[in-house]
A protein has these predicted regions:
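Acetyl-CoA-dependent GNAT
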Residues: 8-85, 96-98, 102
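Short hydrophobic/aromatic beta-strand or adjacent loop that forms the aromatic wall/cage
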Residues: 53, 139-145
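Active-site acidic-Proline motif in GNAT/NAT acetyltransferases
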Residues: 83-89, 113-114
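Conserved GNAT acetyl-CoA-binding A-motif
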Residues: 102-114
C-alpha cells in the first residue's frame, strides 16, 4: 500500500464517496440506520455541499480512502470521512492539513458529543470546543469545535 495522495473531487467520485460515507458512519454509529438516510445524504451531497464546498479526495493505489469538505467562505468543515481500515494511519490528519490550507483563516465543525475518538483527534490538531448545539438531523448534542491560526 502506498501513501495517500490528495486530489480534487471529480463528479465520477460520487458513488464511491457516498458509499464510503455510509460505511464509515455505520462503523462509527452502528446503532443508527445510515442506510435509511442514503437518499437524503445523496441529495444533500449534490445540492448543499458540492455547490459551495471544496472537496478533496484522499486515495491510495487508485482507491478512494477518504475525503474532506470545506466551505472556505464560512470556514465550515462539514465532512471528514476516512475508511475505517485507515483510521489512525495519518489520512485524517492529512485531510485536516489540506482543509487548513483551503481555509487558512480558520475552520469550524460540529462533532457529536459522544464521539470521544473524533473529539480527541480534533484536539490533537489544534481545535478547541467553542460551543454546544444539536444535530438537526439526528437530534444528538454536538460540540462546535474551531481552529484558528
Amino acid at each position: 500500500m502506498s501513501a495517500a495522495t490528495l486530489r480534487r473531487y471529480q463528479p465520477r467520485d460520487e458513488d464511491v464517496s457516498v458509499a464510503l460515507w455510509l460505511r464509515t458512519w455505520q462503523k462509527a454509529y452502528p446503532e443508527l440506520d445510515f442506510a435509511a438516510r442514503l437518499d437524503w445524504w445523496r441529495e444533500r451531497w449534490r445540492n448543499e455541499l458540492l455547490p459551495v464546498a471544496e472537496v478533496v479526495i484522499a486515495e491510495t493505489d487508485g482507491t478512494i480512502i477518504g475525503f474532506v469538505t470545506v466551505d472556505p467562505r464560512t470556514f465550515y468543515l462539514d465532512q471528514i470521512v476516512v475508511a475505517p481500515e485507515f483510521w489512525r494511519c495519518g489520512v485524517g490528519a492529512t485531510l485536516i492539513a489540506e482543509a487548513k490550507r483551503i481555509s487558512p483563516s480558520g475552520l469550524d465543525l460540529d462533532v457529536n458529543i459522544d464521539n470521544v475518538r473524533a473529539i480527541g483527534f480534533y484536539r490533537r490538531l489544534g481545535f478547541l470546543i467553542t460551543g454546544v448545539g444539536k444535530n438537526p438531523t439526528s437530534g444528538k448534542p454536538v460540540h462546535r469545535m474551531s481552529w484558528r491560526p
